[in-house]
Amino acid sequence: MKMKFIPAALLAAAAGVVQADETSGFNLKAGSGITFKSADGTASFRVGGRLQWDYDSTDSDISGKSDDFDVRRARIFFQGKYLDWAFKAQFNLAESGTGGGSAEDLYLRYTGFGKMARITVGKQKEPFGFEQLTSSKDISSLERSALTEFYAPGRNAGVQLHGAGDNWTYGLGVFEAAGNGSDDFGNTAITGRVTYAPIQTDDLVLHLGAGFTSRDAALPANQTDAYNIELAAASGPFHTQAEYFNANMGGVDVDGYYIQAGWVLTGESRPYSNGVFKRVKPSSSKGAWEAVLRYEDGYGKFSDVGLGTTEGKQTTVGINYYPNNAVRLGLSYMDGKQASGENGKEIRARMQIVF
């Protein structure tokens, strides 16, 4: 099998340039990486990544004041497909709070049953949570909600059966429950999610979803069972999403919810695909503007405003500018309050490039 490559610069993608050569099997698209395909279409390889530079200023009654300018995320990924087999390897080069140097995704996937049933083995996102399963490069707010950060398990090693139809998705898997991506299966988790979109057009979407996770632990007090309910909708330039979370942790019940709304001021619609929203794609050379508002209440991880894991409330307002498909500039203000009365605030600015 013969694969032909044409050299190209990643900066072309950053500038919003789209190039394609069907005869050579090479494609460079803004915000979508570089794809190589074999002449007979049986094999493909793609490389891409993201870089997020953040400035954030936090003022908390608990942790005081802090100002930081650092790399929020710097990732590169490689993914490919040959016949009925696919893989993805995504590496975290740098990340605030963790330092980077780890594998975000590292899995092998069998696709021979078609889109309705696929098997993925390796480190991957567990199927839980609308906002969690929306990529960090696509979420409307600069940071996920405090509720998602606390309840959603994120990435772990495991085996998942998942699939999708025209307006529905499902996922069910067994994962290691250590929460650090290790290969120790001493503690396991069973996690699942289903979604259904009774309305799904280019300009109108109604999404319903639900998920659960049951996580074993070495100590009974650390056993966790959680579920969530999802609701999302879009109508032209307006979009909204909400989630309710409930967990029993060693006999202690905690819960919370968030609701978020956005308005694309320049008229574009936020795309919806496979049970999640995608980022705004500007329809003109002037770019697209988006305003975002979120409110959350309950037990969650309010670390962005310096309040830690606690019962609290938080309001977020933000504005995003998308000059092209690859670049995003964002500004947000978060105001949080613990149930006990302590306050925390954060101003965050971000420059993001996806290649």
Named regions from a protein language model:
Residues 1-20:
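Gram-negative bacterial Sec-dependent N-terminal signal peptides
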Residues 6-8, 108, 247, 300:
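Short amphipathic alpha-helical "recognition" segments used for binding
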Residues 22-27, 59-63, 134, 212, ...:
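Outer-membrane beta-barrel pore domains
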Residues 25, 29-214, 254, 258-283, ...:
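Outer membrane beta-barrel
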